Regions:
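Positively charged, helix-rich recognition surfaces that bind polyanionic ligands
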Residues: 2-656
């Protein structure tokens, strides 16, 4: 009997993307602590707790780093530095009474105690902290420390790995294969790129022959022998596995720098050679996070912490036994729970938890859908990520024909440069945000205050001679000793409320600046329901050659997406092609110097977009002038229109 013919299944139709925003299970509202407490004495006690916790956290970070370095140099396995491990470190660095839950991992406790007595305590004659009354606060701190350690590894390991490859494979390539061919530099860059790509895609057989020897020499020191799916994925799921590889890379940088300094100390070399050698010194990174600032940071305070802090001895036990039933009573006794800020939304309920540094406060709210959630129960994660315009269905693209398209080019100088097809523009610059948030003014206040206390500057100048990033065990011990000395001398200076008030003021004014910008979008381009913002997918998370203050990346995109319909556009070639003719453009040079963000197109001379009035066009009569940001915005508008009306991307803006 002949087999039945199988009818091929139709490919699933593109249903597009869901623009409905799912409400987050939690949200926070910022306010000042003094505005919600009933008695100033409460503020005083909370402030003491914040300062005490800050001192514990500073020492905990240094202890963890030293312990991990000790194991690294002994070639022993570094354990997962999770919240459980951090809780044992707290027990090692402090003393408490015998009440409460007993520890289960006695082997780890004994190891940490032995390390503390033999290695850490003698560095500066460390005195153990009194952990009494912190049993409900320390678990939150342990989670925050774990988050900092894992985020450092998750966010930066791949970038650090690529930097290590770029530096040392480059030197190896020059030593082994350098020649006078004109294409040598191009070939070298291609081979190094192929090496990084092969590592990222887990295809080691595709590593170029010229770099296989170098890779095999370093492979076991920069990559694990076993990993899940890929290095990038495994780093996200098992970040602590990559601590020793981070140590190794920093160690190699340090050895390289020592070699450079030995050459500099040679009295026979010229000043020009010294300058050249100094330029080769490599900057080390923080393989494990540290808290170097003495300014007290936010801690989490819940109902149990409040009972521990403020309730009378006879009442504590009874209140702690029935927390949920008593939480409203407890909070109402010490806080102004009748204030409107505690019931701003019908969809969210106050979770009886705050985060504070003694000045500013974040109130934690939970969605009504999880109001009955039991402790430890899982909550479905919310994905409100921004979608690419390429992901839209034909129906959704047809809807965009009725909307005004606004392109937005993210960057370092202009955080967002926005433009529509009518020529309306809106800029949100880094300088504007800095000024409106009072960050610049507040930095000046901090520096003035420091200059009035010259001893602080002298102490910090002395401390700068010791590297916090070193992987050398002895040198890191020296840093811990000097850091402790500096902290003891500057602690009172930084614990002054001025610094926390400045930080609080910066946050509140920054939020005002962002709200003002969001309102300006509507004022410039029309009603929020009538516009669609197509924003470039560049992110300073990947690093930038432009130096300057840290700026918003994905955070600003998410901020815009909260209020407006927002789509991402692949920025490929938008800065390299002329917005008029889609041919190549180049940076304009006058007297050998590039003009900042000024581009020129030799293919077209008629349109003169964004040409500065003070430029003498007779100097470069062969160019049509364009500013980099406006050129990119117009190109992104063209790509968006092409996608909407022709359902594809122009070939000039597609990777070959």
């Amino acid at each position: 009997m002949p087999k039945k013919k199988t009818i091929p299944k139709k490919p699933p139709e593109n249903t597009g993307v869901d623009f409905n925003k799912i409400k987050s299970p939690y949200r926070t509202i910022k306010t000042s602590l003094k505005s919600i407490i009933k008695d100033p004495e409460i503020n005083h006690k909370i402030n003491e707790l914040v300062i005490k916790c800050n001192n514990i956290v500073i020492d905990t970070y240094m202890f963890i780093r030293l312990y991990a370095l000790n194991l690294y140099h002994k070639k022993e396995i570094i354990p997962n530095l999770d919240s459980d491990f951090i809780s044992y470190v707290f027990m090692t660095l402090g003393t408490r009474d015998n009440r409460g839950k007993k520890s289960t991992n006695n082997d780890l406790i004994n190891k940490l105690d032995e390390f503390y007595k033999n290695e850490y305590q003698p560095i500066f004659n460390h005195t153990k902290f009194d952990l009494k009354g912190l049993s409900f606060t320390l678990p939150y701190i342990a989670i925050s420390i774990e988050t900092m350690l894992t985020t450092n590894l998750k966010e930066h390991f791949i970038k650090r790995l690529y930097r290590f490859i770029n530096i040392f494979s480059n030197k190896y390539y020059d030593e082994k294969h350098k020649n006078n061919n004109n294409d040598y530099e191009t070939e070298k860059k291609k081979d190094i790129f192929k090496l990084k790509k092969a590592i990222y895609e887990n295809k080691f057989e595709e590593i170029p022959e010229k770099l296989k020897e170098w890779f095999n020499q370093h492979k076991n020191n920069i990559l694990p022998t076993e990993f899940n799916k890929s290095i990038a994925y495994d780093c996200q799921s098992n970040p602590f596995k990559y601590i020793k590889y981070s140590f190794y890379m920093n160690e190699q940088y340090e050895l390289f720098n020592e070699n450079i300094r030995e050459q500099i100390n040679n009295k026979l070399i010229s000043e020009k050679e010294i300058k050249e050698l100094n330029s080769q010194i490599l900057k080390l990174f923080q393989p494990l996070s540290l808290r170097k600032s003495c300014i007290p940071k936010y801690i989490t305070i819940d109902t149990a912490t409040i009972i521990n802090l403020f309730s009378e001895k006879g009442q504590k036990g009874k209140l702690l036994q029935s927390l949920k039933e008593n939480q409203e009573l407890v909070w109402d006794k010490f806080f102004r729970m009748n204030k409107r800020i505690f019931r701003q939304s019908k969809d969210y309920l106050f979770n009886y938890t705050i985060q504070t540094d003694g000045i500013g406060t974040s109130l934690l709210f939970k969605h009504i859908s999880i109001k009955d959630k039991k402790y430890g129960g899982k909550i479905k994660s919310v994905d409100n990520s921004i979608h690419y315009i390429d992901e839209l269905s034909d129906y959704q693209l047809d809807i965009l024909k009725t909307k005004k398209i606004v392109s937005a080019d993210p960057g370092k100088k202009f955080l967002l440069y926005m433009m529509d097809d009518e020529g309306n523009e809106l800029k949100y610059s880094c300088m504007q945000r800095d000024t409106e948030s009072l960050a610049k003014r507040n930095r000046r206040i901090k520096m003035t205050n420091k200059k009035e206390n010259k001893k602080v500057i002298d102490i910090e100048t002395e401390l700068s001679n010791y590297l916090s990033t070193t992987v050398n065990y002895i040198k890191f011990k020296e840093f811990i000793r000097e850091k402790h000395k500096a902290n003891e001398k500057t602690k009172l200076f930084y614990e002054n409320e001025l610094y926390r008030k400045i930080n609080w003021r910066t946050k509140t004014y920054r939020q005002r600046s962002e709200d003002k910008f969001l309102n300006n979008i509507e004022n410039n381009f029309g009603e929020k329901n009538d516009i669609v913002i197509c924003i470039g997918d560049w992110s300073n998370k990947q690093g930038s050659c432009i130096k300057g203050a840290s700026t918003m990346g994905i955070g600003l995109k998410r901020l815009v997406a909260k209020k407006y319909t927002t789509l991402l556009i692949d920025e490929y070639n938008t800065s390299k092609k002329c917005c008029n003719c889609w041919q190549d453009i180049e940076n304009v040079k006058i007297n050998g110097n590039s003009k900042f963000r000024l581009l020129g197109c030799k293919n077209c001379k008629i349109n003169n977009i964004g040409s500065p009035e003070d430029e003498k066009k007779s100097i470069l009569q062969s160019y049509s002038f364009l500013t980099r940001d406006k050129n990119s915005c117009i190109n992104m508008l063209s790509i968006a229109k092409h996608m909407i009306y022709k359902r594809n991307r122009p070939k000039e803006f597609m990777p070959s």
